[in-house]
From Swiss-Prot:
Localization: Golgi apparatus membrane
Region (Interaction with peptide substrate): 100-104
Subunit details: Homodimer. Can also form heterodimers with TPST1.
Active site: 98 (proton donor/acceptor)
Reaction equations catalysed: L-tyrosyl-[protein] + 3'-phosphoadenylyl sulfate = O-sulfo-L-tyrosine-[protein] + adenosine 3',5'-bisphosphate + H(+)
Main location: Golgi
Transition state stabilizer (site feature) positions: 157, 284
Post-translational modification: N-glycosylated.
Miscellaneous comment: Substrate peptides must be flexible in order to adopt an L-shaped conformation in the deep binding cleft.
Record gene name: Tpst2
Record field: transmembrane: 9-25
General function of this protein: Catalyzes the O-sulfation of tyrosine residues within acidic motifs of polypeptides, using 3'-phosphoadenylyl sulfate (PAPS) as cosubstrate.
Protein name: Protein-tyrosine sulfotransferase 2
Length: 376
């Protein structure tokens, strides 16, 4: 018995010595490589790059840079909230509320690239483009994945993220983008009347806001075209409202997601588990609780100053480029589907449900500001 124990101890000792010898040999080789000026970067293993989350249904979800993320964006007041609410109504998709931080971090990354002096300093410090991109990739994925419940398909809605579509497509090669497009006159009227603060936009001036709208949508549209039609789909707000079923079928086909009738009734899933989460501080919340309706389409007509109407084609040339008539007040957007007409009658009669957790907020909000119906 004593002999067998000795043999076991001897075998264990030999094994430990072998392991230590192998590790020591590896360290010697690494030291030689460093001294010789050849340093191979340590790369994360594929399993380390995955983000693992457990859903309320006890299903494990794994997220990584190769997953098909969805990015929804556009100039604010162009229907981005409506679009993401419709996607949130799908049982396999989760967008959630605006993160607000993702477009700011993307803007910082862009600023570092544009500044030659700053880029030189970063490179000297070893903070190369590869290091920054890996950090951005991990940060963005972490924020998108963890700011809401896990789902098979994750989506992000921060309007200005689509100013960086080309960069995001490089970070997440299987991602797809939905660029919300809306008549700039309607978007600007909504910004001004609802007092939606946007950096750089002078809400006291239709001319200034239309000029800034034109610049913003021009950048986003160019990015969308550069990414390519197979990865970025322009979605016209007016057509989404007038023909929701047709538009959503096209959108889901583009995203490679199976059809579900729930996307046509997002208002029924607001505040419900696995449904549509809304923020009390987002300006569109009081509109998106209603079914898709026509109230917001032409509400801008008659409110834009005459001199701005006269100069519209010069102030906002992107209107014509996107297919809008800059001289029509309002343009003929098309004829609505019967369900949308019915929804509009319901909204005018107040025949829709306000989620219990938002009732007090809307009573206060409606007493302090004029009501604006319609989905935006």
């Amino acid at each position: 018995m004593r002999l067998s124990v000795r043999k076991v101890l001897l075998a264990v000792g030999c094994a430990l010595a072998l392991v230590l010898a192998v590790q020591l040999g590896q360290q010697v080789l690494e030291c030689r490589a460093v001294l010789g000026g050849v340093r191979s970067p340590r790369r994360m293993q594929p399993e380390q790059e995955e983000l693992v989350m457990l859903g309320a249904d006890h299903v494990e979800y794994r997220y990584g840079k190769t997953m098909p993320l969805i990015f929804v964006g556009g100039v604010p007041r162009s229907g981005t909230t409506l679009m993401r609410a419709m996607l949130d109504a799908h049982p396999e998709v989760r967008c959630g509320e605006e993160t607000r931080i993702i477009p700011r971090v993307l803007a910082m990354r862009q600023a570092w690239t544009k500044s030659g002096r700053e880029k030189l300093r970063l490179d000297e410090a070893g903070v190369t483009d590869e290091v920054l991109d890996a950090a951005m990739q991990a940060f963005i994925l972490e924020v998108i994945a963890k700011h809401g419940e896990p789902a098979r398909v994750l989506c992000n809605k921060d309007p200005f993220t689509l100013k960086s579509s080309v960069y995001l497509a490089r970070l997440f090669p299987n991602s797809k983008f939905l660029l919300m497009v809306r008549d700039g006159r309607a978007s600007v009227h909504s910004m001004i009347t609802r007092k939606v603060t946007i950096a750089g936009f002078d809400l006291s001036s239709y001319r200034d806001c239309l000029t800034k709208w034109n610049k913003a949508i021009e950048v986003m549209y160019a990015q969308c075209m550069e990414v390519g039609r197979d990865k970025c789909l322009p979605v016209y707000y007016e057509q989404l409202v007038l023909h929701p079923r047709r538009s959503l079928k096209r959108i889901l086909d583009f995203l490679g997601i199976a059809w579900s009738d729930t996307v046509l009734h997002h208002e029924d899933l607001i505040g419900k588990p696995g449904g549509v989460s809304l923020s009390k501080i987002e300006r569109s919340t009081d509109q998106v609780i209603k079914p898709v309706n026509l109230e917001a389409l032409s509400k801008w007509t008659g409110h834009i100053p005459r001199d701005v109407v006269r100069d519209m084609a010069q102030i906002a040339p992107m209107l014509a480029r996107l297919g809008y008539d800059p001289y029509a007040n309002p343009p003929n957007y098309g004829n609505p589907d019967p369900i949308v007409i019915n929804n509009t009658h319901r909204v005018l009669k107040g025949d829709y449900k306000t989620p219990a957790n938002l009732k007090g907020y809307f009573q206060v909000n409606q007493n302090s500001t004029s009501p604006h119906l319609g989905s935006s």
